[in-house]
Amino acid sequence: MGEVGTFALVALVGLLTFAFVASAVSGVARGIHWLSNINMVLAIVLAVFVFVLGPTVLILNLLPTTIADYSAQLATMSGRTAASAGDDTASWLSSWTIFYWAWWVSWTPFVGMFLARISRGRTIRQFVVGVIVIPTSVSLVWFAVFGGSAIGVQRDGTDVASQSSTEGQLFGMLDHLPLAGVSTVLVMVLVALFFVSGADAASLVMGTLSERGTRHPSKRIVVFWGTLTGGTAALILWTGGTDALQGLQTMTIIAAAPFLLVMIGLCVSLYRDVSRDPLIVGPTKESEHERVSDTL
């Protein structure tokens, strides 16, 4: 199969833009909620499929081992820089650790506000469990299933690691499992749905910011931001190809770097706010004294 042309990619961007704009306009309780549930069901189906038809015993053996190794090396790996090893490690760190963290910084305004929107009424404990503990646990299992399957295929003599991209490695691994055609289609559907469910949340947040923090931005504002986002990607892709789009991603991350200072300020603000919350601090000495005086 030959390489997909620019026109086909632009058409795909247009189709996905229409999908996430329609989802965003329908609101959190309808389209976004519906798509998110479909995403999770299909992801579970895919993970179970790979776990059952792949090297199940190897995956079960890798799961506790990798989690223990990850926990033991987390601090070391978090502080690792290019000075710790050679050029290959430096290249990997720049493309994964640094780039990936910077990418999440650029998504912080959208993800943070959207999580705050859907978490209204939850306790801090519920928020931490739902946003940090559960996603982290699911991610560990997910990487163990797919990483273990790829390792199993590699051990069997098929060199999937030599594929030029991570996408090629994924599809190369799926090709060695039964029903490869079905799983390949399922992966592509999942990628599209996860993109739509992320972009519709971003459109909704930009609409909220444009209307001074309202919880229900007008549909025309949401459509405007969604169309502008998709149109910008399509225009850059049409004029400069995938290289230009990657350049835009890099520029976005660089522009988002100053937001690290805002994130630090938000952490300090959250700590101060929580430390003064009456439900956490409890009654002050003054209020206790007043209560004792009233009793007497």
What name fits each language-model region?
Residues 1-10, 43-49, 112-137, 199-225:
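Helix-loop-helix connectors at the membrane interface of multi-pass transporters/channels
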Residues 2-26, 45-46, 101-113, 219-234, ...:
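Transmembrane alpha-helical segments of multi-pass small-molecule transport proteins
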Residues 6-23, 56-57, 75-83, 87-119, ...:
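Hydrophobic, membrane-embedded alpha-helices of multi-pass small-molecule transporters
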Residues 20-32, 52-64, 87-91, 111-124, ...:
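Transmembrane helix-loop junctions in multi-pass membrane proteins
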Residues 25-53, 62-72, 129-135, 249-262:
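Membrane-interface loop-to-helix entry segments
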Residues 44-83, 146-151, 263-276:
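Hydrophobic alpha-helical segments and their helix-loop junctions in multi-pass secondary transporters
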Residues 72-90, 147-181:
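Membrane-interface interhelical connector segments
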Residues 132, 137-141, 181-205, 209-268:
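C-terminal transmembrane helix pair
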